[in-house]
Regions:
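A structural signal for short, well-ordered beta-strand segments and their strand-loop junctions
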Residues: 62-64, 91-95, 130-136, 214-216
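Acidic/aromatic/glycine-rich contiguous surface patches that form carbohydrate-binding/processing clefts
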Residues: 201-232
Length: 232
């Protein structure tokens, strides 16, 4: 499913939206809570979101809420889940915000462990029918050593500039590509996704029974054709 990263929670329990083409229909709406004050009227905001889903023909809404879970955010999701279900829509939530009736999103942008173990553990815990992939496009620069495991996000032009002329390799454990470089005497490990790695993540999820996945627009706009080749 294509997800439109264009909505956020605003002051006064209002739904704010970036400009979208009036004729845009279908896909999912992504709800960000970045820099949002407490939601004081979750029922009213939930109704706004549901109305927008119906007006735009969205199949549902995905909550892109930062951890940790906050009581006001959970209250909104608890109002929204049955409201969307009554309209034949789906609510997608991050693992730290589980609510009854919602589908849990699993982020596939890993920097350690294995993706197969991650998905298998989630299937065992929640059941494949309650899961969907959050197919984030990974592009991260990790200085080595990196004890905290936190890298620096890269834009696509930055990634392309760093990768130019360098051999890249595939990590089967992470289902991602990588290369190394040395800058100012320090070694860097750059991990990234392309259409092939994202497709491999989809294939692995399907093997485990996870049939639903979200890709974000405009994040993967340049990969849509190779990513979904043969899907129609």
């Amino acid at each position: 499913r294509l997800a439109h990263v264009a909505y956020r929670l605003g002051p006064g329990s209002e739904l704010l939206a970036a400009p979208l083409p009036p004729a845009l229909r279908g896909g999912l709406m992504v709800l960000s809570d970045w820099d949002c004050p407490p939601v004081e009227e979750p029922d009213r905001l939930a109704r706004q979101i549901a109305r927008t889903c119906l007006r735009r023909g969205y199949a549902g809404a995905a909550a892109n809420f930062d951890p940790p879970a906050r009581p006001d955010r959970l209250a909104l999701l608890e109002e929204l889940s049955p409201l969307l279900a009554s309209c034949g829509r789906t609510l997608y939530v991050p693992e730290h915000c589980p609510v009854a009736g919602a589908t849990i999103l699993l982020c596939t942008a890993l920097s350690g462990g294995t993706l197969e173990d991650r998905l298998t553990q989630a299937v065992d815990q929640y059941g494949a029918e309650h899961l969907a992939l959050d197919l984030q496009r990974l592009a991260m620069d990790f200085p080595l050593p990196c004890p905290g495991g936190q890298g620096t996000p890269l834009t696509l032009p930055q990634l392309e500039a760093l990768a130019a002329g360098r051999p890249t390799f595939y990590s089967d454990a992470l289902c991602a590509r990588y290369f190394t470089l040395t800058r100012q005497g320090q070694t860097h490990f750059v991990l990234f996704d392309d259409a092939r790695t994202l497709r491999r993540k989809l294939e692995l999820a399907r093997q485990l029974g996870i049939r639903d996945a979200l890709v974000m627009l405009p994040e993967v706009e340049d990969l849509l054709e190779p990513l979904f080749a043969g899907e129609r």
